[in-house]
Amino acid sequence: LSEWGDKLLDFYNKNPEFVKPNSRFNEVVSFVEQGLKDLSISRTSFDWGIKVPGNENHVIYVWIDALTNYLTALGYPDVKSERYLNYWPANYHIVGKDILRFHAIYWPALLMAANLPLPNQIIAHGWWTVEKEKMSKSMGNVIDPNEMISKYGLDQFRFFLLREVPFGNDGDFSISSLVSRVNSDLANSFGNLVNRVFSMTNKNLDGLIPDAEITDKEKILIETCDEKISDYMVFFKNVEISKALESVSDIISSCLLYTSDAADESCSV
């Protein structure tokens, strides 16, 4: 491994989007810049596992075994297999921040040594706590996602998880924060906008949107929405889903203000 530090740094320099978020990438680069030591890829402390060829007293280190599963599950070493050709190199590896070093340093070095293509991007996510406490079975505070979905809805639960925590950060879960986020962003904002538009359309326009000239107010609204859509696309590409959804919330707020002004003026859209 010690011989691959410069090659890794060169790869990182040429592929600045390889690890997201950037703060995690900086940690990876800093670690490699300090100099890599050789990594033992076998263990003798237990006898279960894949035996090392030529020395059956050793078994392959479980992390080396685990990483190669990305390839062997696709048919490797048959690099002409349909699965391998369809799915490798992977577009994304989505991993916890605690195993980033294995995926962003050891794994690329192994692939380089084997003359195999590297995954396109590694996304490192944070951890969840529950009301500032670590999740554990002994404490009885493990969140069952099926229970959350059953009680609050699948889309609502997904929205909360994606919106509540900035990409790459650790997040803290509580029922109160889930309810607050869903009520505020989905029911009171998005739901209110949908209800207001349909109600005004049915009441004043017989449920049909007529042809009409675009006024300066509509032009401003369209420009605002276009800007936020552009922001959304940038954030989404960078896997900053929370910020992307914040852009959607900004669009909803602008539309709510527009419909409110329209109602005050003439109850027409």
List where the protein language model places each region.
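Short helix-adjacent coil turns
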Residues: 239-243
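Structured secondary-structure scaffolds
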Residues: 1-203, 244-248
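Core structural elements
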Residues: 246-257
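Conserved small/polar residues in nucleotide/adenosyl-binding loops
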Residues: 258-265
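Acidic, turn-prone loop/beta-hairpin segments
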Residues: 205-233, 260
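Generic hydrophobic alpha-helical segments
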Residues: 8, 28, 231-232, 255
